[in-house]
Amino acid sequence: MVSKITLLCFAITCDVLISMGTVQGVFNHSVGPLAVCSPDMEDARAYTENCYRRCSRNKEPSTHGYVWLYSDTAPKGGPVVTRCNKVRVKQVFTETWSFSFIKGTPTRMTLDVTEAECVAVMRSQCPTHNCNIKAPSELPEEYHYASDTEVVQDYLEILSMPSGLDYMEENLRITPSQSKFSFQLTDGKGQEGQYIYFWDTKYDDTKCPFDSFQSHGCDKYDSPLDLINCRESRFVIPSIANSTTLVGACQGLQKSTTGLIYKWDDRPDSIANDSKRIALTKNDQTAGNVATLRVLVADSLNAVDEDLCHTQCEMLDFILRSDRKREVLTRIGGSYLVVSKTSYIRQCRPLVGCRIVKPHYFCGNPNRVAIICHGKVWYWDPLKSYVDEGMNCERRVAGTKLVFAVGNHEYAIDDDMHVELPEHETYGISHDLLASSEDRISKDIVDPTELRNSWQSHIAKEGRMSIEPLSQDKQVSHWDAEFSNPLTWLTSAGGWILDMSHKVTLWATVFLTLGALVAGAKVWEIMRKANRKSQYKRTNTEPHDSQATWI
């Protein structure tokens, strides 16, 4: 079956054409990330043991009401930010005795950079701040016989990227892509570790970019649990005391510790079933003769909840014991986790209402596309169901493609907009934990041809990019043989003479050794033949008297 792909923001819409017949149809498939995950590894055993202890909770909530969830409706977030940093790239090239070549994997290390260095390069190479200057993904190859050659080059990288907006203070703050820090919009520049950011302070947007798209009936538990537990998908807002209240244009909204933008609508006296999670909170109309039944049903639901929670903990234990070839995203209660191949875990936070940033931005190694989720910009690898925090934005590695995972299949934007799918495979609409068919979340259609053209333009632009290293060095480590080198006096004439010295000496040694072995074998064979002849004796036979003589 051949399917033509059309991308929805984060759904795939396919016009299905079965090649063996005339049946046509359309299906949608969600391909967006569900969570953003920390790079920090944690002990999975300790987390699993804690998992069971976290399954118990209070039977009665403190109050109940509605949680309104908000999604970012801004087309591109905040202003374009130009990031500057210095990087040192190392790569080892090996030539063996048998003239084979081994190319090592490049390694990157971020160095300190000054504002003056960044400004000088931006003025000369990208004065409009539309910059895409990146260190090469691989260094020029350099080989020396029977040696390891470590090539080291330093580069200044300047990259333009989108940003998100924060409304946690009266003055707007911006958060650059993949950054954990926010900066005052009016500052025009900021520094995070070894990265320096620049942006235009004239950006002005007085409208709040967040719009409500869902409401959920929830139960609120005060300290020590300090959380909101909602119906539908069992999503949880933890540590509500630590939520941040937004101000300015977004006054009244709150941002949870996991990044969700929400508004709490307290309804303690509501008898509507959808205004709470378990609909068992006591009120005047349900008091009296139904009090006992209320308590019994609450106990039963609490037992069911604890059983489900323990089952999820057991599933996590099974995943940790299984043989995994890749990292696995799983959900335990209201939390997402990535389980590594080595049985460590990384904690994740849910993402809601993600959209592709326009104009499109891309990164390489691995290939990623920029997305915006509740006010923050991330670079997402479409082969994964989650976003990795804190990754560098490097050049694309030659020959690689931008690949989306479509169910159990992979679709490369670089290809001809068609993908082979099994004829009898069933497809449906896949959502994240908060999506429903009635929600008002934005699903802007993304033309796959437009995305493909942007990706190919990005590849062509990087192909034309010319960047000179700030400094370069190399270190050649020769594989010295265990004998005195009679030609070492030639090393002063230059490195190429030293290479020739090694080649001549090593191969002369090899041939001399082989010659000695052959000569030794010949001498041994001659000695063995001589010894064999000395063991033979000549015997003269005289005729006997009884012999007859014929006449």
Curated annotation (Swiss-Prot):
Residues 525-551 are intravirion. Residues 1-25 form the signal peptide. The keyword Glycoprotein applies. GO terms for biological process: symbiont entry into host cell; virion attachment to host cell. Keywords: Glycoprotein, Host-virus interaction, Membrane, Signal, Transmembrane, Transmembrane helix, Viral attachment to host cell, Viral envelope protein, Virion, Virus entry into host cell. It is found in: Virion membrane. The chain crosses the membrane at residues 504-524. Residues 26-503 are virion surface. Glycosylated by host. Glycosylation is crucial for glycoprotein export at the cell surface. One of its GO terms (cellular component) is virion membrane. It is a single-pass type I membrane protein. It comes from the Viruses. Attaches the virus to host cellular receptor, inducing endocytosis of the virion. In the endosome, the acidic pH induces conformational changes in the glycoprotein trimer, which trigger fusion between virus and cell membrane. Homotrimer. Interacts with matrix protein. Belongs to the cytorhabdovirus glycoprotein family. This is Glycoprotein. It comes from Lettuce necrotic yellows virus (isolate 318). The gene is G.
